[in-house]
A protein has these predicted regions:
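Cys/His-clustered metal-coordination modules, chiefly Zn-binding fingers
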Residues: 198-305
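Interaction interfaces in information-processing and related assembly proteins
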Residues: 1-230, 298-305
C-alpha cells in the first residue's frame, strides 16, 4: 500500500495531500540517533517536506526547508524532490527538554520560537532558485509551514503534522496532511472545511487507530466528494555518492586542495544526511584538478570532422 496520496474535491476547489511517514521518521531516528524531542522536530519537518515535494510538477525539482530557531536543537534541514522522497539533518540531535504541561514533547522549545523558516525552491526551468522566508510562528513546524504558505505564496493552507515517540525512543507512528484552498472557494466551503478539521482527531491518534492517508482525506474533505489523484511510496533517501562527493571536492580548485593535502593527504568526507563516509587521496585529487584545468575546451579549430 502506498504511503502518500494526493486528492482533489469533486468541484476542484480543495487539494489534499496526506502521508504516513512512520518509516521515514524511523530511518531518520536510526541515522541521527535523535532524542525523543528531536525525533519529533526533525520528523515533522521531513513529513512536511515529503508533502510539499509531492506537489511539485517535475520530479527533478527540489525543495529545501531550513528552520533556524533560537532553541538548543540548532538548525534543522529537510530536502525533497518531486517524488516526495526526503533526507534531513539536525545540528544537535541529542537535545532533550521536559514535557510540556499537556504531556506533549516540547518541539517548539527545542527549535526555538524566535527564528526563521527558509524555503528554497529549485525549478530546473529557472536559472536561480526561488527563496522564501517567514518568521517562525511557534517552532512547532506545522504552524510555521502554514504561515509560509499564507504569507510567502498567498495560498490558504492547513498543515497538520505528528510524530509519536515510544518510551524506548523508537517511532510509534508519524504522518501529516496538507490542505489547500484553490481560488474561488466559497464561504460555505471554507466553513465546512473548518468544521471538518476541528472534528478530526490528531494525526498520531488516527495513525494509531489504523487510519490511512486516504481515511484522513475522507474525514478532512467530508461533504466535498474527494477523489484520489495519485498515490505513491515515499522514503528517506539520500542521493550522495562517491562520485558526487569527489566533484564537490574538485570544485574547491587546485590551490585549496593543495592546502588540505599539506595538512593531511588522507581526506574523509561524511555526509550530513546519512553519515556515509567517503575516503579520498588528496594527492590524486590535486592531479585530477590539474588534469581538469589543462584539458582543452573543444573549439571549431581543434574539433576534427
Amino acid at each position: 500500500m502506498s504511503n502518500l496520496i494526493r486528492g482533489l474535491s469533486e468541484n476542484g476547489g480543495v487539494v489534499f495531500c496526506g502521508v504516513d511517514s512512520t518509516a521515514i521518521v524511523r530511518k531518520a531516528e536510526q541515522l541521527h540517533k535523535t532524542s525523543a524531542t528531536c525525533s519529533a522536530a526533525l520528523g515533522r519537518l521531513l513529513t512536511g517536506a515529503a508533502l510539499m515535494g509531492s506537489m511539485l510538477k517535475d520530479d527533478r525539482d527540489t525543495i529545501t526547508l531550513r528552520v533556524s530557531g533560537s532553541g538548543p536543537a540548532g538548525v534543522l534541514i529537510a530536502c525533497t524532490d518531486g517524488t516526495g522522497n526526503v533526507k534531513g539533518c539536525i545540528d544537535n540531535p541529542l537535545v532533550e527538554l521536559p514535557l510540556k504541561e499537556n504531556g506533549h514533547l516540547d518541539v517548539g522549545g527545542a527549535v526555538g520560537r524566535d527564528g526563521v523558516l527558509t524555503v528554497i525552491r529549485d525549478n530546473r526551468l529557472q536559472k536561480e532558485p526561488t527563496v522564501g522566508q517567514v518568521p517562525l510562528v511557534s517552532g512547532e513546524i506545522a504552524e510555521d509551514l502554514t504561515s509560509y504558505y499564507a504569507y510567502s505564496e498567498q495560498v490558504p493552507t492547513v498543515c497538520a503534522l505528528g510524530v509519536l515517540v515510544d518510551k524506548d525512543l523508537t517511532i510509534a507512528c508519524a504522518g501529516g496532511y496538507l490542505i489547500q484552498l484553490l481560488p474561488g472557494a466559497t464561504d460555505a466551503e471554507i466553513t465546512q472545511l473548518e468544521q471538518n478539521i476541528a472534528a478530526m482527531p490528531s494525526v498520531t491518534e488516527m495513525l494509531r487507530a489504523g487510519k490511512t492517508p486516504e481515511d484522513m482525506m475522507q474525514l478532512a474533505l467530508k461533504g466535498f466528494e474527494p477523489n484520489v489523484l495519485d498515490e505513491r511510496d515515499v522514503a528517506y533517501q539520500c542521493d550522495c555518492s562517491h562520485e558526487r562527493t569527489e566533484e564537490m571536492l574538485l570544485s574547491l580548485g587546485k590551490k585549496e586542495l593543495e592546502k588540505l593535502r599539506d595538512e593531511d593527504p588522507n581526506c574523509e568526507v561524511v555526509c550530513h544526511f546519512c553519515h556515509t563516509k567517503y575516503q579520498f587521496d588528496l594527492n590524486e585529487l590535486v592531479q585530477k584538478a590539474v588534469d581538469k584545468h589543462e584539458t582543452p575546451v573543444p573549439t571549431e579549430e581543434n574539433e576534427s570532422v
